[in-house]
Amino acid sequence: MRIPVEYIWIDGARPTKRLRSKIKIVDVEDRTNVSLGDMPDWGFDGSSTGQAEGNFSDCKLVPVRVYNHQYDHIPLVLCEVFHSDGIVHETNTRHALARMQEELIDEDVWVGLEQEYTFFQGQRPLGWPEGGYPPPQGPFYCGVGADEVFGRGLVLEHMYSCLNYGIQLSGINAEVMPGQWEFQVGSGDPLKMSDDLIVARFLLYMLGEKHGINVSLEPKPVRGDWNGAGCHVNFSTKSMRQDGGLELIHEACARLGDRHKDHIAVYGHGNEARLTGLHETCSINEFRWGISDRGASIRIPMDTAFNRKGYLEDRRPAANCDPYEVCHILMETICK
């Protein structure tokens, strides 16, 4: 049986990589349960994606995870990028995370990813008055009503699409700035959660196309007294989740502080406009951690402090971060 499948990959755009996709027609035995074994390697013009020069432009797509839809929609195939000779491409950050996760398998790392994003219609956030501004922030976070939240129909459509594709979505909410939303993925192993986040972003972009709404992952989409957009990461190891784990979380915070600049370097372009010390952030030039402190670099949730075990939340990553790079450096800093 011949069916269409959508190959998805991350390009080499700078300073922030983008998603690319194209459709391939493949032969499968069971269209309701397409597997990696059904998916051949493919190629693309790397000179058009910032991943090759025009005189040697072929790059290879290697399928690494298939997302089947429970109601027979087109399967989605997440791919890694390789050079035509089979060498891992420099833009392929997933490959390094897969190796790191295998190396640290006994740590049993879990992550949860909180993806914030902003809807735009034309040059202004969705729901904002033309040529003006909405009322000050306050009523919009988890708001209800057509005067407080904008784009809920698309958000719910995205939620169900993610669930139907088997993405480990754990929640959604309207955010502090009007026109801004968040969805959460996880918790689970870093590679699967990062894959799920990339495919969830892809679905959000595709639904935005359908509705004529642009989806922005800019860390500070509107200058001024408005919240930015982040991708907070909830992180734990098996030992942190066990009795006495709080001491290990404190040790992890100290390690993270020692490598603050290294982390900021891979936490998303334009993050300096967001990490100002205002709007529930810590200054990009400062590192501190605290219990239940959303103005800290690292927040230890109240339940974690009370139970003396659990997880930490790294609040520094920007909405446009590469989750593979973020999870890789967190594991490297905390677990090695």
What do these predicted regions represent?
Residues 1-336:
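Glycine-rich, acidic/polar active-site loops that bind/position phosphate-bearing ligands
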